[in-house]
Amino acid sequence: MSMKKDMKSIHEKMMAVILLMLLLTVASQAHAAGGTDVDDDSGLPSDSLLAIDLRREGEVFTAGNNVTLLMTGQQKFDDLFAAIRQARHSVHLEYFNFRNDSIAMLLFDILAAKAAEGVKVRALYDAFGNSSNNQPLRRKHIRELRERGIDIHEFDPIRFPWINHIFGRDHRKIVVIDGQIAYTGGMNVADYYITGTPAVGAWRDMHCRLEGPEVDTLQKIFFRAWKKVTGEDIGTEGYFNGKTPRYEYNGLKENGADTADRMLCATINREPHRSPKAVRQFYYHAISDAKDTIRLINPYLTLIPKIRRALTDAVERGVTVQIMVAEPSDIPLTPDCVFYNCNKLQKKGCQIWVYKPGFHHTKVIMVDGRYCTVGSTNLDARSLKCDYEVNLAILDKNITRQLTDMFERDKKDSFYLADGVYKQWRTPWQRFRGWFAHLLSPFL
């Protein structure tokens, strides 16, 4: 009888512990679902709030990084080519596409020369990204590149049934050299980042060079993509910081910041099935934690409801929200949706500038002069919910100021979407197209 009582007592205690754990779990989830995790009244600056919120999302900032902005195609390719020419060990490239033009051919010549020296050169390109540009790499080009020592492969080849390959495209742009220098941002490999195009004029975009411990994160991202495509696991071959001798790279652009080698950075990587919410949660927290000013440039501002609400909520709590979009665009219908959204956001109190001289394909956000991001992510449903994307989040006032200065300069080449301007600027037919396009925004 006593044993039965003891067993009953133990059972009751176990049930009590389990119930307590369940209550704590539910309370924790309810707290996390409430939006910004730290009350604004806490007095913490927005960059501290962002770091706390992202940590709860599983994103951790590393210290000791150095970021250099590359604000033009010429800057990007000059810097990238100079670094690759000095590679000693490995060059890994992951792009949405390599356009079959002069800048790509120059890149491949440099890579082939490094391969001849014994440097391991691996490259990935997205099948849809390649086929959707007007100068794709053909099979004969891929064969020739492999014969020259460049180990290049296609991410997710498009095969029947084609509908299975619409989503989950690799839109990232990553280069890692010797495991010590990385490049990421919004630019693929194409002449038009330097020359522009007849259709849109100058093609503006943003890239950056990264040095420091966060390079390892980009290297790991490449390794996972490489294994997915080729089946080869190369993640243990000593391609990380500290696993190879420390090399010097000369002739690269200086970042002009007095915080060099002391920057806090986090890689925000969206992968279906692994981290599907990463980028949209970053943007949500970046906007929701703002206390003073948000400056945002994005080419395809078709938005999802969560980000749209975050922007209008920011205005309601007194944050100045400034958004820049481009008047020219490289695709149909999407810009109609963008301009429709801009009109709606302007009515809610956002300040909108429309950039006229060319296509501003830049994807950046700057908040409170304290933090920013540079990356591949468009603020559309495809980037935020479907594709592989990567952004570098940077907690640094110097880099944020450089991007803010660019924003202010570009205002001079933009017109302000004041009250009534939308109806003067867009014809009734264009406004109807915008309304219709916004209905399709989950698919744009």
Question: Predicted segments — roles?
Answer:
Residues 5, 24, 28-444:
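Charged, low-complexity intrinsically disordered terminal segments
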